[in-house]
Design a protein with these regions (language model features):
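Transmembrane-helix signature of polytopic, membrane-embedded enzymes
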Residues: 124-148, 166-167, 182-186, 248, ...
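Loop-to-helix entry region of an early transmembrane alpha helix in multi-pass inner-membrane enzymes
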Residues: 89, 93, 101-122
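Transmembrane-helix motifs of polytopic, lipid-linked glycan transferases
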Residues: 31-34, 111-132, 140, 171
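Extracytosolic helix-loop segments that constitute the early lumenal/periplasmic catalytic or substrate-binding loops
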Residues: 59-83, 90
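Extracytoplasmic
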Residues: 87, 242, 361, 365-500
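Membrane-interface alpha helices of multi-pass inner-membrane proteins
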Residues: 175, 184-212, 229-234, 309-315
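Hydrophobic/aromatic-rich transmembrane helices and adjacent perimembrane loops
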Residues: 114, 203, 319-350
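Specific aromatic-rich, kink-prone transmembrane helix
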Residues: 151, 164-183, 189-191, 333-340
C-alpha cells in the first residue's frame, strides 16, 4: 500500500511540474505574440508617412490610380507615356477614395494595405477560433502571421496589391468553411475579389473548389457558377474597355516570363525551411497520422488550402520577378494550420508531458521568426540620400529617366516614365505587341530624348549601351524591404556620336 501511495504521489508531483512548465511556456508564447504584434505595427507607423518609396514599384500603384482619376484606361498599348503593371485592377479602384480623401501621396495607399492587414489578422484569428474554440491557439495564429513580416520581405504595409489580395483570399476561405448556402456565395464573391486584385489567386481557389466538390456537390455547383461568372463578366468588360489589352497585360505577358530554376531548391533551403521547418514537420506529421480521416471532415479544406497556397507561392517564386512577397499566401496557411493541428494533437494524446513538448516546439518556432524590427525603418540618413539623388536630377535640363522610380519624379518637376521592370519585361519578351513600343524606345535613345538615365548597376537593358554610356557617377542607398541590401544606381549619359540620321 505504501509503494502504491508513493507512486501515485510521484505521478501527481510529475503532473504538477508539467502543469507549471506548461503555464510558463504559455506565458512566454503570449509574450512573443505581443512582441510580434507590437513590432509589426511599430514599423508600420514609422514608415507610414515616409514621403518616398519603400519599395521600388510603390509609386507605380499611385500612377495607376491617378490615371483612372483622369478618366484614362490603364490597360493601353505600351508607350513611353505609360505601361501598366501586370495585375488585375481592383486594388486601384479601392485606392481611388483614399487618394480623394487623404491626398496624392504614399500615405493614402499604404493606409489601404495597413487596414487590410488589420482585417487579415482578424480573419486569421476567426478562422482558427471557428475551428478550435480556443483563444490561445487563435492568438498563436495571429502572432505567427505578424512575425512573418520579415520572411515575406517587409511587405504587409507597402502600397502594393498583395495584402488586399491575401485578405480577400482568406475571407473566401473563412466563409467556405461554414458550408452554408448564403456564406458559400460570399466565399465565391471574395474569391473573385482576390482574382480581380491579383489574378494568380485563381490557383489557390481551384484547390478549395476541389474540397467543396468532395464535401457538397450542391454547394460546389452554385459556388462554381457564381465565381466563374464574375470572372467572365469582369474579363469581358475590361477587355472591351481596353480594346483587348487587358488580356495581354494580365495573362499573355506574364505567361511569357522565363523561369528561375535555381529556386526549385532555394525556395526550400533559403526561403522556408530556416524559418518554418518546425511548422512544416508538425503539419506533415499530423496529416500523415490523420490521412484516413481527412476526407470525412472539414480538415480536407485545410489540407487543400495548404497545397493551393504552396502551389501558388512556389510557382510565382520560380517565375521571373517573383520576390519574397509571393510567400505570403503559404505563410498565411502555415500560420493558420499549425495552431489547429497542435490543438488536435493535444486532444489526441491528452497528456501534460506531450503538451509540454508541443508548446516547446511552438515557442521555438516563434523564436525562429524573431527579427530586428529597426531594419526596415528608414532613417534620416536614408531620407537624405534619396533627396540628394532627386536634387541632383532637379537641376538637369530636359527629361531624365529614373528607371527604378515612379511618382517621386513629380517632387522635382520631372515627367514620369514607365518603370524599368515594365520596359524590360516587354523588351525581353518574344511578343508582337512589343514592336511599336520597342521602335519608340529605340528612337528615344537614338535621338537622346533623355538628358540622363538612372539604372541599377546590376541591371541591363536592351539597346541602352548602343546610344548611352555608363558614367562613374552613382548613388548608393538602402533597400527597406530586404535585410542589409543596398542599391547602387549608376548614371548613363548620351554618347557624343550623332545618331539622329
Amino acid at each position: 500500500v505504501k509503494k502504491i501511495k508513493s507512486k501515485l504521489n510521484a505521478k501527481k508531483f510529475s503532473e504538477g511540474n508539467f502543469l507549471n512548465i506548461n503555464k510558463l511556456l504559455t506565458f512566454f508564447i503570449y509574450l512573443l505574440i505581443a512582441y510580434a504584434i507590437f513590432s509589426v505595427f511599430f514599423v508600420f507607423i514609422s514608415r507610414l508617412f515616409f514621403p518616398y518609396q519603400l519599395e521600388w514599384m510603390e509609386g507605380g500603384e499611385i500612377e495607376h490610380i491617378l490615371r483612372l482619376l483622369d478618366g484614362k484606361c490603364i490597360y493601353c498599348p505600351p508607350s513611353l507615356e505609360f505601361i501598366p503593371y501586370i495585375y488585375t485592377p481592383l486594388f486601384y479602384y479601392i485606392g481611388i477614395p483614399f487618394i480623394k480623401i487623404f491626398g496624392v501621396n504614399f500615405f493614402s495607399i499604404r493606409l489601404v494595405s495597413i487596414l487590410g492587414f488589420v482585417l487579415l489578422l482578424s480573419t486569421t484569428y476567426l478562422v482558427v477560433f471557428k475551428t478550435t474554440k480556443n483563444k490561445f491557439w487563435s492568438f498563436v495564429a495571429v502572432g505567427l502571421l505578424a512575425f512573418s513580416y520579415s520572411t515575406t520581405g517587409f511587405w504587409f504595409d507597402l502600397a502594393r496589391v498583395d495584402t488586399i489580395a491575401n485578405l480577400f483570399m482568406l475571407l473566401s476561405f473563412f466563409f467556405l468553411l461554414d458550408e452554408n448556402p448564403k456564406r458559400n456565395l460570399l466565399s465565391a464573391f471574395f474569391a473573385f475579389c482576390a482574382f480581380y486584385t491579383k489574378q494568380s489567386f485563381i490557383s489557390v481557389h481551384l484547390f478549395l473548389l476541389l474540397g467543396l466538390l468532395i464535401r457538397d456537390k450542391g454547394l460546389f455547383s452554385k459556388h462554381f457558377l457564381l465565381y466563374f461568372s464574375l470572372i467572365l463578366v469582369s474579363t469581358i468588360i475590361e477587355t472591351i474597355r481596353s480594346n483587348g489589352w487587358y488580356i495581354f497585360w494580365n495573362f499573355t505577358l506574364p505567361a511569357s516570363h522565363y523561369w528561375i530554376w535555381s529556386r526549385v531548391v532555394t525556395f526550400w533551403s533559403i526561403d522556408l525551411l530556416p524559418f518554418y521547418s518546425i511548422s512544416l514537420a508538425l503539419i506533415l506529421g499530423y496529416f500523415f497520422v490523420q490521412k484516413d480521416e481527412l476526407f470525412k471532415s472539414k480538415e480536407i479544406y485545410f489540407l487543400l488550402f495548404l497545397i493551393g497556397t504552396l502551389f501558388n507561392s512556389y510557382f510565382l517564386r520560380l517565375h521571373y520577378g517573383g520576390y519574397l512577397n509571393v510567400l505570403i499566401p503559404f505563410v498565411i496557411s502555415i500560420s493558420i494550420v499549425l495552431p489547429i493541428i497542435v490543438f488536435r494533437f493535444q486532444q489526441m494524446f491528452n497528456s501534460k508531458n506531450i503538451q509540454t513538448i508541443l508548446l516547446t516546439l511552438v515557442l521555438v518556432q516563434f523564436c525562429l521568426l524573431i527579427y530586428d524590427f529597426l531594419t526596415p525603418i528608414p532613417t534620416q540618413k536614408d531620407k537624405g540620400e534619396i533627396e540628394y539623388l532627386l536634387n541632383n536630377f532637379r537641376e538637369t535640363q530636359g527629361d531624365v529617366y529614373l528607371m527604378g522610380y515612379n511618382f517621386v519624379q513629380r517632387y522635382i518637376g520631372k515627367r514620369d516614365f514607365p518603370h524599368y521592370v515594365l520596359v524590360n519585361d516587354l523588351l525581353i519578351a518574344n511578343l508582337k505587341e512589343k514592336e511599336s513600343f520597342e521602335r519608340e524606345f529605340i528612337y528615344s535613345l537614338k535621338t537622346h530624348k533623355f538628358s540622363a538615365i538612372l539604372l541599377d548597376d546590376d541591371l541591363t537593358l536592351k539597346h541602352l549601351d548602343k546610344y548611352y554610356y555608363k558614367t562613374d557617377k552613382f548613388f548608393y542607398h538602402r533597400v527597406f524591404n530586404t535585410k542589409n541590401v543596398f542599391r547602387k544606381e549608376v548614371v548613363w549619359l548620351p554618347k557624343q556620336k550623332d545618331y539622329s540620321n
